[in-house]
């Protein structure tokens, strides 16, 4: 318990660092010197959407606690893992974490729950290959911004959950993507940067009601016509007293 709390505090401190400049004076970007493993396929297929990158600190330690990073794209993109690392991953590496930045299938590739299935497959892959990449999976945090924050929150609130039902609609949250379905997909801490928590409240925004909205693309229809599915995409619907430690960051204009 104490180790998990300490890791979350370290994660929060690293988040504060994200607000600091990441370049040297004059716009010169400091060269990367830390160990990196690029384009690892966590699903055992050929999809770009199923690749991840691992970044380790340059301290030479034997193992590092892990933070998974998910980019934001309104669920439209399937290949922005590099942007996820540059946006919020680099300060975490500087703070001593191993950062795993992942791709996932877009709403154009497949409808929900494919995206959370991919996230969980990536977590299982990391556990299965912890020794190969110097990872200490006794702590796995997850963070992301916008739609990546949404998927991070969803990963956290669905620890120990295989399927979930709302009304007459059931979704397979865990999924069976990849070769490591015997491994756990649980996470120990979540930091959500302005990702939707209750998708139903987004109905107040006129653009969300549109059948062409990002939310509609994610679930395969207008949100107003699919209330059960909208609820199933909402992290709020899964909250119990047993969820891991959470930090959700929103602004007044989100």
Task: Label each PLM-derived region with a short phrase.
Residues 20-254:
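Alpha/beta-hydrolase superfamily serine-hydrolase fold, recognizing
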Residues 1-24:
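Bacterial Sec-dependent N-terminal signal peptides
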